[in-house]
Amino acid sequence: MTPPTTTNLLRGAFAVTAAALAALLPLAGTASASPFTGHAHRTVTTADGETFHLRLTAESTLLPAAGGTVDVLGKGYNRAQGIFLAFCVIPDGVRLGDPSTYTTLPTPCLGGRESTDGSARRITDQGTGTPGVTIPYEKGGRFTTTLDLEPEIADGVVCDTTVKCAIVTRADFTATSSRLYDQYIPVHFAPAHKG
């Protein structure tokens, strides 16, 4: 009998890891049951010279095939500028983590422009907006909320099938053309379990 080689040991370890992940995916029924967390951050300077360190965190970024609820936390945002938090198609040309490529409005988004299905929020201190959709910033430009996500953004626009999708922040309708607050956390959906 010959001793196992490093290559054989690595193959075995990879097989065990892959099997463990395959066993976990069907159990990820809710965001809280999944260990996958996404992060985005960038530092921005406004025309007034103020600097903001934007941080965005989402739990979970791997959802069941039918969708699920994701907990989202933001901090460091400019309280003088409202933002939209939504689930959108990642525009062509955007390279995640490279804000110099964030030149196009993220669209389409789940729920459309006037979403009331829990798939989007407007965060603002202006005090106007749709109850349950519009929420105020907390101290330090923070916000904590949930998003209810599903893979079909619109007819024929399906995440992980026809497009790539992400939880995004962007300036609200008071500054739609500004890309200063754009951030992306990609989200994926586990394949439907056959059997």
Residue ranges and their predicted role:
Residues T2-G12, A22-G195:
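Extracytoplasmic/secretory-pathway segments with low complexity and glycosylation-like composition
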